[in-house]
């Protein structure tokens, strides 16, 4: 009986979480003249793809916004990997390092900060560096929130790898600087893919709040900010808006579905043990 109740609760929770997504998909496919139909049918009789074409007509810069969002997400992922790989290797292998535990504690603590808590200091720093209204400002700001968990995941994964392989490479004449690119990185491919997708999705989801304070140039806006700026100036056309938002979710969803095996393996491999 207890198992049944747990399963029932899980099913109801999943349905509750999927309802907004279902409503978004249905609204994006529903003809505009039926959008105000009351009561709104759970399964509309008519569907159309014209809302997607209309979204591009209403928001001429939509392709540019999509490209900007991809650039921001990919940039955050790249910086996260550049920092997390060597940091994770150092923390995972050199356990005699004096400040290893404080650094690991700081990495855990850094995950507790929400982006909205740091918006003001981030803006002040970017302003002083002259990076406001640049791609790099949003990428750098987004990386602040992905590097800690990325480093933690890489450290955890590296601890599951046998150190004998690296020791054998050293004996064969491989320098310490070549071990990371030639030995460690190929063996940590699942963790690298997991970190890349995690950082991309996180960077994608945080673009709006970061770009809202760092970007005012219309050409540099990500999709979420561009849609907000456009639809806040005019009457909301829900069908076209939902179509545009649905398109914005496809890239991270497709990436997750393609690499989900590596993501799960990278996220669950190993644990931090001293």
Label the predicted regions:
Residues 3-274:
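A structural signal for multi-pass alpha-helical bundles of membrane permease subunits
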